[in-house]
C-alpha cells in the first residue's frame, strides 16, 4: 500500500507536470511510490511495526510526506538525468533525496515512530539477554582476563 499519491509528488515538482506522456509517466511514478512504500514497510517491519501503517493519522501523514519526498527525488532524476553543477536541478534532487534519507534514518533508529503504533510480536530477533534484561549471565572463567595487573609470573 502506497502512503503517497501522484498528487503528492506533483505538488513537490512545482511547475513540472506529470501525465501519461511525460518522462516518467504517472504510471511509472506510481511504481516509484510502490518501491518507496516497500522500503518504508521493510524498515518498520524490522522494528516490529505492523505494516501497512494505518494509524495514528499524524504518523501516516509523516510516511506520506517521506514517501513523496523519495519519489520526487527519483522523478526529478529521471526527468533530468544529466543535470549537474551549481544552480541546476541537481540541488533540488539532493534536497528531496536528503529529506528521504534523513527520514528513513529516523525510522531506522526508531525516533520517528510514535507511541500508539501497533507493534507485531512475530519474527523479532531475541536472545537470553533481550528476554531477561535484568539477569546477569554468569560467564565463569571466560570473562576473567588471562593476564592480571600486579600478578607475578
Task: Tell what function each PLM region has.
Residues 24-31, 62, 66, 87-91, ...:
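Alpha-helix boundary/N-cap detector
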Residues 39, 46, 50, 69, ...:
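Surface-exposed polar/charged interaction patches
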Residues 61-75:
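Elongated alpha-helical scaffolds
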Residues 1-62, 121-153:
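Conserved short "hinge" loops at termini or chain/domain junctions
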Residues 4, 73-153:
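Short loop/turn elements at secondary-structure junctions
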Amino acid at each position: 500500500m502506497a502512503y503517497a499519491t501522484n498528487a503528492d509528488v506533483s505538488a513537490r515538482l512545482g511547475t513540472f507536470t506529470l501525465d501519461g506522456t511525460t518522462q516518467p509517466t504517472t504510471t511509472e511514478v506510481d511504481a516509484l511510490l510502490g518501491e518507496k512504500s516497500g522500503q518504508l514497510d521493510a524498515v518498520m517491519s524490522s522494528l516490529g511495526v505492523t505494516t501497512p501503517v494505518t494509524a495514528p493519522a499524524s504518523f501516516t501523514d509523516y510516511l506520506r510526506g517521506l514517501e513523496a519526498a523519495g519519489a520526487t527525488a527519483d522523478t526529478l532524476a529521471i526527468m533530468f538525468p544529466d543535470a549537474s553543477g551549481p544552480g541546476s536541478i541537481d540541488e533540488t534532487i539532493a534536497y528531496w533525496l536528503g529529506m528521504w534519507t534523513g527520514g528513513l534514518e529516523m525510522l531506522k533508529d526508531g525516533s520517528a515512530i510514535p507511541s500508539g503504533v501497533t507493534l507485531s510480536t512475530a519474527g523479532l530477533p531475541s536472545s537470553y539477554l533481550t528476554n531477561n534484561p535484568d539477569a546477569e549471565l554468569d560467564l565463569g572463567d571466560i570473562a576473567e582476563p588471562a593476564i592480571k595487573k600486579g600478578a607475578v609470573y
